[in-house]
Swiss-Prot record:
GO terms for biological process: rRNA 5'-end processing. One of its GO terms (molecular function) is nuclease activity. Keywords: Cytoplasm, Hydrolase, Nuclease, Ribosome biogenesis. This is Putative pre-16S rRNA nuclease.
Amino acid sequence: MRIMGLDVGSKTVGVAISDPLGFTAQGLEIIKIDEEKAEFGFTRLEELVKQYQVEQFVIGLPKNMNNTNSPRVDASITYGNHIEHLFGLPVHYQDERLTTVEAERMLIEQADISRGKRKKVIDKLAAQLILQNYLNRNF
């Protein structure tokens, strides 16, 4: 069963996919979106869903450190509701506190990637971490 992980931001959506057995997550790509123009990347997402035969989604919830909802939580849930409606597939949510910080740390310490290059891959890596955390917790 393939699960797609998403890190939803206001300008990009990081995308990750699980292996067929649901053990590991791999970053796929970053989809550019524009909330103000109501462009949410659903066409590209549909292509990926078909290509990887996705059966469910995991979307990161950007909670605050004190476990309250950040302003982006509502946007992530709204995005999840759209996906559930468009694809008819279940959507789960995963606390994503510190995943972007962890992703940035990994890119600096392990890959020694410059700031400019980090911006191009950080959302994809964050989506991978969100999905891997979900897989570790549920499978």
